[in-house]
Structure formats: structure tokens, C-alpha cells
Amino acid sequence: MEPSPAAGGLETTRLVSPRDRGGAGGSLRLKSLFTEPSEPLPEESKPVEMPFHHCHRDPLPPPGLTPERLHARRQLYAACAVCFVFMAGEVVGGYLAHSLAIMTDAAHLLADVGSMMGSLFSLWLSTRPATRTMTFGWHRSETLGALASVVSLWMVTGILLYLAFVRLLHSDYHIEGGAMLLTASIAVCANLLMAFVLHQAGPPHSHGSKGAEYAPLEEGPEEPLPLGNTSVRAAFVHVLGDLLQSFGVLAASILIYFKPQYKAADPISTFLFSICALGSTAPTLRDVLRILMEGTPRNVGFEPVRDTLLSVPGVRATHELHLWALTLTYHVASAHLAIDSTADPEAVLAEASSRLYSRFGFSSCTLQVEQYQPEMAQCLRCQEPPQA
């Protein structure tokens, strides 16, 4: 069957295999999906256009990165290069100045480099298709990279905290105020440059493609919720935190430069900035643990999803409802829908899938439709999970 010219933007897939051509189920399935008469299929089934409610939210994306992701990758490359160069400079400057505060700032930059490299690696992996072993693809590589970045920051910060404690106990150390002031000033400039690079606007988003990273809501009073590129946004917020820390180190270096007797400001600021650095990892660690523990996606509640499914005409009950996230923006849902005997399973499936996609922005939904049985009300496995 040749696809209709008006069916632009629909997903290309296979309807039936050659061995199903003679089956009545395949004919009924085709008849329920298309209104115009279909021509006999050739010996080998050809890919044809499928309507939205077949099973997927979006058309099959083109191979490679979208323009938005390409722009995000360029931003991350530039910011990562700047961050690495100035991190190396801070390590050298901190060593020459004998400043733990500078080293703490360099450790924070090290975490930034690791985070951005993990984001770049995940952007590259996201172009690889799913396999029979990795059926979900490689989406969680970004989560693992974020976890590695947090662990590395904790290790380096722990060492610096120990050294700062030793310095407070024993005052036999000397701070080179000039070298510390110069290094801290360069660090502030580096963070300003990285913030400028990451804050640059990307190309205009394209409609009808998931690469634009928009979570469409239902048409009505609410507007589409722009998500942007999560990796770039996270890096930008992280750089803003580094900028505040760099200003603090700069203030401590100015004090030590003009008042060398106040050299204790170096280990004291190391304590303060280490606490800030560890605290900044709390949101990332919370998101990582929630994803790895198969928790519900952030900003998606169990009750709203359940109520949305129960509001579909013909649905009497729902059970086995599971919501989880592969990444912060790739959300998945699965559920069993118990329907009335008079309800059309195809219509219920199409309507329920459409509501989940449009209202919550799920990337993948798997729904099983079954006849409602009275004993489901007493079945323990059909009950809702308790509130956490």
C-alpha cells in the first residue's frame, strides 16, 4: 500500500509480516486502522505509514543528532575545554600559592569537567540504536556519568577537608598571597566565560520532532512546557554555583594578600566551600538514586496518571501501574486496563495512550487491555501500592 501524501510526519513501520497475509486478524487490524480500502500486499511486506495511535508518540527520528542536540554538544565541548584548561591552571596556581581554597575550587571544576564529559558521552551514545541486549538503548549512561562525577567530587573534597583540618591544628604553613590572588581572579573570569558559553541560545526548535525536547500538553489553556537541553541547563546551573565559590575564594585571597596574618582564612574558606560543594551534589544524587531505583519520574504523580486512565470511557479499573524514568526527560509507563464488556478495546487503548502522551509527556507507554472481573476488587495483586 502506498502511503497517503497527507500522512506526513507519521511513523514508518511494518503492519504485517508475509506469513500473516492470509490471517483474518491482520485484515481486521488493518480495517480498524484505515478507512480507505487496502490493496493486496506484495510478497514482501513494505513499510507503510501508521497513524499516531498505533503505539508510538512520535515519528521515527532521523539518524544522528538533531540541530538542538548538535548545538548543545558544541556548547558542552567549548565549556569543557575552558573548564579543563582553567582547572589545570588552578591546580598549578594552588600548588604554587600553597592554598587549599584554590585546590577546593579546582576540585569543583574537576567535577564540572567530569559532568560535562559524561553529558557529551551520553549525547554520543543516544545516537546508537537499541539492541537485543540493551533494549532501552543507552539512555542511562548520562545517569551513570553523573554518579561517577559526584563520587569523584566527594573523594577529592574529603582529602581537602582533612588537609584543611590539619592546617587549623598546625599553623606551620605559608600562603603566597600574590599567586593566590592571581589564580582566584583568573578562576572568576573562567567561570564567567563558561557561563556565557552555556547561556547562548540554541537554534530555533523544530516542530514535530522529539529532538526539540518539548513535552507537549493538551491543547487548551496550558502552553507547551519547554524542557530545553537538560545537560546544558544542568551545566549552566553548576557553573553559577562555581562562580559564587570563586568569588568567595577571591575575597579570601584579597584578605590574605593585604593581611598575611589572617592566613587561617584559607583553611576556613576551604571548609565553607567544601560544604557548599558537597551540598550542590545533593539534587544530582537524589535524581540519580531515584532513576536507578526505578522511582516515579520527577513532576509526574502516581495519582494523576491513575485518574487519567480511569477517566477514559469504558475503563472500570487499573492495576499493575508502573511509572519510571530512564533519564530526567525519558519517562516510561505501563499498566493494565480493566474495561467493560461493551467497550471497544482498540478505542480504549488509543484514547488512554493519547492522554498519557499528551498530558504527561511519556516517551514510551505499554498498556494491556483486559475484561473487568468482579474478583479484581479483592485481588491483592490488583490493589494500588501504599503511599511511600
From Swiss-Prot:
The chain crosses the membrane at residues 76-96, 106-126, 146-166, 178-198, 236-256, 265-285. Residues 1-75, 127-145, 199-235, 286-388 are cytoplasmic. It is a multi-pass membrane protein. Its main location: membrane. InterPro entries: Cation_efflux, Cation_efflux_CTD_sf, Cation_efflux_TMD_sf, CDF/SLC30A. Residues 1-46 are annotated as: Disordered. It is found in: Cytoplasmic vesicle, Secretory vesicle, Synaptic vesicle membrane; Synapse, Synaptosome; Late endosome membrane; Lysosome membrane. Residues 97-105, 167-177, 257-264 are lumenal. GO terms for biological process: response to zinc ion; zinc ion import into organelle; zinc ion transmembrane transport. Pfam families: Cation_efflux. Homodimer. Homodimerization could regulate efficiency of zinc transport. Interacts with TMEM163. NCBIfam families: CDF (TIGR01297). Probable proton-coupled zinc ion antiporter mediating the import of zinc from cytoplasm into synaptic vesicles and participating to cellular zinc ion homeostasis in the brain. This is Probable proton-coupled zinc antiporter SLC30A3. It comes from Pongo abelii. The gene is SLC30A3.
